[in-house]
Amino acid sequence: MPKPLTNKFNEFLRQSPISLHVPGHKNMTIGQLEQLDFKMDMTEITGLDDLHQPEGIILKSMEGISKHPDYEAYYLVNGTTSGILSVIQGFSEQRGKYTMVRNAHKSVFHGLELTCQNALLLEMDISLKTNQYLGPDLSNLRDQIQDTKLAIFTYPNYYGECFDISYTTMQLKEAGVPVLIDEAHGAHFGLEGFPSSSLNTGADYVVQSYHKSLPSLTMSSILFIHKDAPQRKNVIKYLTYFQSSSPSYLLMTSLELAHDFYKKYDSALFFDKRYELISILKQIGLEVIEVDDPLKLNIRGNGYTGFELQKLFEMENIYIELADNNQILLVLPLWHEEDTYPFELLLERLKSINFEKRKAHKKTEIEYLTEKGVYYSGEIDKIRNININKSVNKILATHIVPYPPGITFMFKGEKITENMVKLMNYWQDNNLRVEGIRNHKIEIKDE
């Protein structure tokens, strides 16, 4: 029998790849995962408790995940996705609407599809540094959240940028609106020198992907539930629906180890090595864009697209998180004493990259849709293709997703505006890859 996965990984690992991407253990060079033993991959035998009705060691382990006294921690073995789905489902029978940001993770939209409910899309602000969605436009937030049963925010964004989550949560709480914060990329927040976690804002539900920035196994996340959160019993019930009936003890144990790492972490060495890395990146001619989260670096090269930079890095077996037309994104390790991360080798390989001197190319800035909108769940049965320029006031029958960054810009069920048509034409005219548009045509609801 052919073994394509086994063979590929064996081949890949022989090249000694260096990780500047998730997961946070960075090819098992960060943290304490050497304490894991595959013999721990067991089932719920006597003494090992049950994640779906924890009364023993699993309950005690989760009680030890203390980041804020007002929250209880719940292990997620099906990723942050399972936590998001559970919270959305937990509010499905309540009156009112869901309200959310446009840069929500796809699991939010999947949750709305499963509940067959629509959502208000908030007006958005755009980052001047990265040209990505930053957060909601806070100038008239209170006017947009009327009759909201659950508000959903992404903090930080994928590129490591933060908005005023404290003010945002305060506005929602004063209006009596429950809040879910997708803090997938902020499990390390709260460490010295890093942004504050939204756990300090009183949000009702905060979900963190420990595996993205802390040293735990992929798919291991934690849902933090406030002691006064509405619908908490419902949400806890749905955690059993959206997670495997055979939860992995390896994943749960890795969460315990990662949290122990977090509680003991001293960030001084991290910032020393980060400074040295930034110096080398600048020395070889790259531009370093620093953002709110020190763990993320956005890198640009004069005359290079992000995709070209990615190829140059990969030629030296350095693997980054993502590339777009203008930059690449690095996710740094949480360096610590006794880590085995190949830092000196990374610097050597970076110095080996041969950058040609190029004239600066015109940046291809994707324009974002920032206006208020509505996301409609459910399937659209009758559809037809139509030229973009004839689509104003029609109903989109599919999502419009430019790649990268792979964020849904326009949503199935939205009414097409003149601004949307302008954006779609801009993307097509600049040869950007956009899922949902082909040869200046899109799918609309046939009415």
Regions found by a protein language model. Give the residues of each.
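Conserved PLP-dependent catalytic core of the aminotransferase class-I/II
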Residues: H259-V288, K311
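Conserved N-terminal alpha-helix of the aminotransferase class I/II PLP-enzyme fold
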Residues: F38-T81, N103
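Active-site phosphate-binding strand-loop segment of PLP-dependent enzymes
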Residues: T130-H188
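PLP-dependent aminotransferase-like
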Residues: G96-D147, A151-F153
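Conserved beta-loop-alpha segment that forms the PLP phosphate-binding cup at the N-terminus of a helix
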Residues: E72-R95, G111
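Conserved C-terminal alpha-helix-loop-beta "cap" of PLP-dependent enzymes
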Residues: K282-P404, F411-K412, E418-L432
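Active-site PLP attachment segment
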Residues: L199-I236, Q243-S254
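N-terminal "arm"/small-domain region of PLP-dependent enzymes with the aminotransferase-like
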Residues: M1-G56, V177
